[in-house]
Amino acid sequence: MSRKGSTPQRTVLPDPKHGSETIARFINMVMQSGKKSVAEKIVYGAMDVIGEKNPNAIELVQKALDNVAPAVEVKSRRVGGATYQVPVEVRSSRRMALAMRWLIDSARKRGENTMPRKLAAELLDASESRGGAIKKREETHRMAEANKAFAHYRW
């Protein structure tokens, strides 16, 4: 383990189109193999599709992220010879990261024909508390609820 202390949190520059740090992080999460321009086209394309139905796309994205973000998750903890799934609260930075990851993964699994449409549909569903990302959050919360008895093993 390093003795130099923790590394400082990297700052993300706000995205050029909307000036939002959340959207910039979302673009970075969508990006694959360093292709940022492709990721920007996907996210901005999805926001344009959302913009046709809802004039305030940024608020809708924020609402979708808030709906998907988990409050608790389970972590494995070894005690004696047994491994317990211990429920722990999720810190805010990890909440947003998980919400973005789940939204993007669910969007990639959807059946629409282009990625911007898949992402837009998933964001619209998540803002109305339905869709694959919401299912993932509910499953995580169910796991934490089922293992509430092991909450005293927290670290």
UniProtKB/Swiss-Prot annotation:
One Gene Ontology MF term: rRNA binding
A GO cellular component entry from the record: small ribosomal subunit
Highest rank taxon of the organism: Bacteria
GO biological process assignments: translation
SUPFAM superfamilies assigned: Ribosomal protein S7 (SSF47973)
Alphabetized InterPro entries for the sequence: Ribosomal_uS7, Ribosomal_uS7_bac/org-type, Ribosomal_uS7_CS, Ribosomal_uS7_dom, Ribosomal_uS7_dom_sf
Gene3D superfamilies attached to this UniProt entry: Ribosomal protein S7 domain
Keywords, ordered alphabetically: Ribonucleoprotein, Ribosomal protein, RNA-binding, rRNA-binding, tRNA-binding
PANTHER family documented for this protein: RIBOSOMAL PROTEIN S7
Function field: One of the primary rRNA binding proteins, it binds directly to 16S rRNA where it nucleates assembly of the head domain of the 30S subunit. Is located at the subunit interface close to the decoding center, probably blocks exit of the E-site tRNA.
HAMAP family the UniProt entry points to: Ribosomal_uS7_B
Quaternary state and interactors: Part of the 30S ribosomal subunit. Contacts proteins S9 and S11.
Family of this protein: Belongs to the universal ribosomal protein uS7 family.
Name of this chain's protein: Small ribosomal subunit protein uS7
Species assigned in the record: Xanthomonas euvesicatoria pv. vesicatoria (strain 85-10)
Protein encoded by which gene: rpsG
